[in-house]
């Protein structure tokens, strides 16, 4: 199984509001980047969408080392998600987990892979995280500008 590195970030203006997501995949010197967005979303939805889109770009099962500045995504991937599934997406507060549809899609696209997430501090000089942040903010701004027309 190949080991790939996935960097991801999401951005949301006004939260909720226009948002953007971005990822960078790296494998043996090869790099793939993509980004997108939505007119009305949240920061957590964009953070999670970035990971989903990055996983969808993989052509075969991989060991995925995910680096994200979202503690929400990192904690869910590494520990919360199993409990949510067992409890039919009811959280520890006895309320439905937010973004259920996106988490279900994450489960579907991550199934062939072995994903481990690491949290990295945002805006701390990590080159790939900074690039993802820039790409995601550009998409969020684009969607906000289109909504203003």
UniProtKB/Swiss-Prot annotation:
Monomer. GO terms for cellular component: cytoplasm. Its EC number is 3.1.26.4. The gene is rnhA. GO terms for molecular function: magnesium ion binding; nucleic acid binding; RNA-DNA hybrid ribonuclease activity. Mg(2+) 2 binds at residues 9, 133. Disulfide bonds: none annotated. InterPro entries: RNase_H (IPR050092), RNaseH-like_sf (IPR012337), RNaseH_domain (IPR002156), RNaseH_sf (IPR036397), RNaseHI (IPR022892). It is found in: Cytoplasm. It is an enzyme of class 3 (hydrolase). Mg(2+) 1 binds at residues 9, 47, 69. Binds 1 Mg(2+) ion per subunit. May bind a second metal ion at a regulatory site, or after substrate binding. Gene3D superfamilies: Ribonuclease H-like superfamily/Ribonuclease H. Endonuclease that specifically degrades the RNA of RNA-DNA hybrids. Its cofactor is Mg(2+). It catalyses: Endonucleolytic cleavage to 5'-phosphomonoester. Residues 1-141 form the RNase H type-1 domain. This is Ribonuclease H. GO terms for biological process: DNA replication, removal of RNA primer. Keywords: Cytoplasm, Endonuclease, Hydrolase, Magnesium, Metal-binding, Nuclease. Belongs to the RNase H family. The keyword Lyase does not apply. PROSITE patterns: RNASE_H_1. It holds the Pfam family RNase_H.
């Amino acid at each position: 199984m190949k080991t790939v590195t996935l960097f991801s970030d999401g951005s949301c203006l006004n939260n909720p509001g226009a948002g953007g997501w971005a990822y960078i995949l790296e494998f043996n010197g090869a790099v793939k980047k993509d980004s997108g967005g939505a007119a009305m979303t949240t920061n957590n939805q964009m953070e999670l969408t970035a990971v989903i889109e990055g996983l969808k770009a993989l052509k075969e099962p991989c060991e995925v080392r995910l680096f994200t500045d979202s503690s929400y995504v990192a904690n869910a991937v590494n520990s919360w998600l199993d409990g949510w599934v067992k409890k039919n997406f009811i959280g520890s507060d006895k309320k439905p987990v937010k973004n259920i549809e996106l988490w279900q899609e994450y489960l579907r696209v991550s199934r062939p892979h072995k994903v481990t997430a690491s949290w990295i501090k945002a805006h701390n000089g990590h080159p790939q995280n900074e690039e993802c942040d820039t790409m995601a903010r550009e998409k969020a701004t684009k969607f906000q500008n289109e909504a203003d027309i």
